[in-house]
């Protein structure tokens, strides 16, 4: 039996996530581990579930995710965008609701590079008048 699935990619900071949406009972697997086991902190798990809770489909899909790069916050944001894109492929009518919540838009903020002569990206060495 061929199982239909919807695919979505998400990116945030330096993380990228591949999300596969299949019909099921609400199981979320990230890199072959359960969602709570992978992230540990509840805030990251909440970020991942946001698009599903918004459209009332928490228990409708099993979600399989592979995510690479970045840290906890970036990976959670990338997964959220991937789930959003997969939901839109599943049902186009959800697009307006997800757009209004701001889940479709890619968060383009990146880490600013360190400049030569500065201690960090913008922190200058201490200024001495005399």
From Swiss-Prot:
Domain of life of the native organism: Bacteria
Keyword list, A-Z: Ribonucleoprotein, Ribosomal protein
A Pfam family: Ribosomal_S9
TM segment ranges: none
Protein name: Small ribosomal subunit protein uS9
Keyword Zinc-finger on entry: no
GO CC annotation terms, alphabetical: cytosolic small ribosomal subunit
Gene name, Swiss-Prot/TrEMBL: rpsI
UniProt keyword Ribosomal protein present: yes
One biological process term in Gene Ontology: translation
Gene Ontology MF annotations: RNA binding; structural constituent of ribosome
Organism: Buchnera aphidicola subsp. Acyrthosiphon pisum (strain Tuc7)
Similarity comment: Belongs to the universal ribosomal protein uS9 family.
């Amino acid at each position: 039996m061929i199982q239909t699935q919807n695919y979505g990619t998400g990116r945030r900071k330096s993380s990228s996530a591949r999300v596969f949406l299949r019909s099921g009972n609400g199981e979320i697997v990230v890199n072959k581990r359960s969602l709570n086991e992978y992230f540990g902190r509840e805030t990251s798990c909440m970020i991942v579930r946001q698009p599903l809770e918004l459209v009332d489909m928490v228990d409708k899909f099993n979600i399989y995710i592979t995510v690479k790069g970045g840290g906890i916050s970036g990976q959670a944001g990338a997964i959220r965008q991937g789930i959003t894109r997969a939901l839109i492929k599943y049902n186009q009518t959800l697009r307006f609701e997800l757009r209004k919540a701001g889940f479709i838009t890619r968060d383009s903020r990146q880490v600013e590079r360190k400049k030569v002569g500065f201690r960090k990206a913008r922190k200058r060495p201490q200024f001495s008048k005399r």
